[in-house]
From Swiss-Prot:
<dbReference type="InterPro" id="IPR032678">
    <property type="entry name" value="tRNA-synt_1_cat_dom"/>
</dbReference>
<keyword id="KW-0030">Aminoacyl-tRNA synthetase</keyword>
<keyword id="KW-0648">Protein biosynthesis</keyword>
<feature type="binding site">
    <location>
        <position position="250"/>
    </location>
    <ligand>
        <name>Zn(2+)</name>
    </ligand>
</feature>
<keyword id="KW-0862">Zinc</keyword>
<dbReference type="GO" id="GO:0004817">
    <property type="term" value="F:cysteine-tRNA ligase activity"/>
</dbReference>
<dbReference type="Pfam" id="PF01406">
    <property type="entry name" value="tRNA-synt_1e"/>
</dbReference>
<feature type="binding site">
    <location>
        <position position="225"/>
    </location>
    <ligand>
        <name>Zn(2+)</name>
    </ligand>
</feature>
<keyword id="KW-0436">Ligase</keyword>
<keyword id="KW-0067">ATP-binding</keyword>
<feature type="short sequence motif" description="'KMSKS' region">
    <location>
        <begin position="281"/>
        <end position="285"/>
    </location>
</feature>
<dbReference type="Pfam" id="PF23493">
    <property type="entry name" value="CysS_C"/>
</dbReference>
<comment type="subunit">
    <text>Monomer.</text>
</comment>
<dbReference type="GO" id="GO:0005524">
    <property type="term" value="F:ATP binding"/>
</dbReference>
<dbReference type="GO" id="GO:0008270">
    <property type="term" value="F:zinc ion binding"/>
</dbReference>
<dbReference type="InterPro" id="IPR056411">
    <property type="entry name" value="CysS_C"/>
</dbReference>
<dbReference type="InterPro" id="IPR014729">
    <property type="entry name" value="Rossmann-like_a/b/a_fold"/>
</dbReference>
């Protein structure tokens, strides 16, 4: 198994620190707005990684943080106390910063759940880990890598020139970097020094401040992740992930402050690529954005998940007007085979279907396994999936039920690894499934009789009635088969 490590800029063999166990941290959301496709693509990429590691037999501990205190959250909350230009005084939403953060956190969780992103082992909030952050800051001060601001602001800064490996993650020299944007330049030794602790400023809510040895204030963004990952995964762990846009300054600063504190920190750094809109960077200002919610208005959750997870995680994923249609067609081909195979192999619509669909058989094809072991090469893995679907359909047509069953087991296992087996699947009622099957089979029996007597009008009428109800009928050499139309 080999993954690309951003820090070494090469694909390396992955060997976990503890045999049989993997520790993974990936950056979650700063909950100051609704999720965008970049957030969701990143979550799906690391969900695929987790599922593959688990399939390979590893016990995976996953930590995904929630940044629930930040400059952007405070700014957004302050704006929410004033009416929008389209709203009247009665429509003003008075919302405290913590309430705003919680509301958007729930929106992220809903999006993750809808698109089949597994819940992490731990999902810590920054505001719940202030003591750990204080301890990390004090340790950096004691080691000579941090200092209280040279004015009365109450800030504490990381001294980038005290750490000779600063810039190594992104292969930059300090003198070529711009000044850190996350704090005012006053009180700094170097404009590139970044804030570990931000002193309380006039006009900020007192509820967004905590007492510290350096004055009342709140943590810096970069410090939050270092403190939380260390608490849950220790000072050395296997994989740190996130979007490519977080590589600098966020991950560069995380690595510097953690290693300067004496922590080995991450063994691998993995970054997923961005999502573009018809070849251009998405931007609200020019109106070329598409949100997960908008995608879900156009396609089912499984189709959206297929689209957002179909590219190799490090590559750019480009959104085109036809992207979801193409993903829907691919999902339809997969589901068509599954429906056909279940009907043939289970002996009825429901009986035996659960064993066929929901049991893990450990039978992914060698080509699929080789692709996933090769830095999560999902495009090649999907090619193996569709090859298996074609082989399964061929086996069904030939009446080779043994080969068809093997193909079905392989397909369901591959879908499970890719997170496509049960994305936002509605609860199934076995009695309802049985009743539906009996009714549809009765209609198909009547249609077969009509066709036998060449009553084509009656045959077409039955087919049209079933189609209107969402039942797709396909005629084959062994008679008619049916499946439910997918969203």
């Amino acid at each position: 198994m080999r993954f690309y490590d951003t820090a070494s800029a090469e694909v390396r063999d992955f060997v976990p620190l503890i045999p049989g166990k993997v520790s993974l941290y990936y950056c979650g959301a700063t909950v100051q707005g609704l999720p965008h496709v970049g957030h969701i693509r990143s979550a799906i990429a690391f969900d695929q990684l987790t599922r593959w590691l688990e399939y390979r037999g590893f016990r995976v501990t996953v930590v995904r943080n929630v940044t629930d205190i930040d400059d952007k959250i405070l700014a957004k909350s302050a704006l929410s106390f004033e009416p929008d230009f389209e709203e009247g005084p009665d429509d003003v939403r008075e919302e405290e910063w913590w309430a705003l953060a919680y509301r958007y956190e729930q929106a992220f969780l809903k999006a993750y759940d809808t698109l089949g992103v597994s819940r992490p082992t731990y999902e810590p909030r920054a505001t719940g880990h202030i003591p750990e952050m204080h301890a990390l800051i004090q340790g950096l001060i004691d080691r000579g890598h941090a200092y209280p601001a040279l004015d009365d602001s109450g800030d504490v800064y990381f001294d980038v020139r005290s750490w000779n490996r600063y810039g190594s993650l992104t292969r930059q020299k300090i003198d070529d970097m711009q000044g850190a944007p996350d704090a005012d330049p006053r009180g700094k030794k170097d404009p590139r020094d970044f804030a570990l602790w931000k002193g309380h400023k006039e006009g900020e809510p007192t509820t967004a401040s905590w007492v510290s040895p350096w004055g009342t204030g709140r943590p810096g963004w970069h410090l939050e992740c270092s403190a939380m990952v260390t608490k849950y995964l220790g000072t050395e762990f296997d994989i740190h992930g996130g979007g490519l846009d977080l590589r600098f300054p966020h991950h560069e600063n995380e690595m510097a402050q953690s290693q300067a504190a004496g922590h080995a920190f991450a063994n691998f750094w993995m970054h997923n690529g961005m999502v573009t809109y018809q070849g251009e960077k998405m931007s609200k200002s020019i109106g070329n954005t598409v949100s997960p919610a908008e995608m879900l208005e156009l396609a089912s959750p499984r189709v959206v998940r297929y689209y957002l997870g179909q590219a190799q995680y490090r590559s750019v994923l480009d959104y085109q007007p036809t992207s979801l249609q193409e993903a829907a067609a691919a999902v339809e081909r997969i589901d068509g085979f599954i429906a056909r195979a279940v009907r043939t192999l289970s002996g009825s619509v429901v009986s035996g279907a659960a064993e066929l669909l929901f049991s893990s058989h450990g039978t992914v094809p060698d080509a699929f396994a080789a692709a996933m072991d090769d830095d999560l090469n999902v495009p090649q893995a999907l090619a193996a999936l569709h090859d298996t679907v074609r082989a399964g359909n061929t086996a069904l047509t030939a009446g080779d039920n043994s080969a068809a069953r093997t193909a079905l087991h392989s397909v369901t296992d591959m879908l499970r690894v890719l997170g496509l087996n049960d994305v936002a699947a509605p609860a199934r009622d076995e009695q309802a499934d049985t009743a539906l099957g009996v009714l549809v089979e009765a209609q198909l029996g009547a249609r077969a009789q009509a066709r036998a007597t060449k009553d084509w009008a009656a045959s077409d009428a039955i087919r049209d009635t079933l189609a209107a109800a969402g039942v797709v009928v396909e005629d084959g050499p062994d008679g008619a088969s049916w499946s439910l139309k997918r969203g």
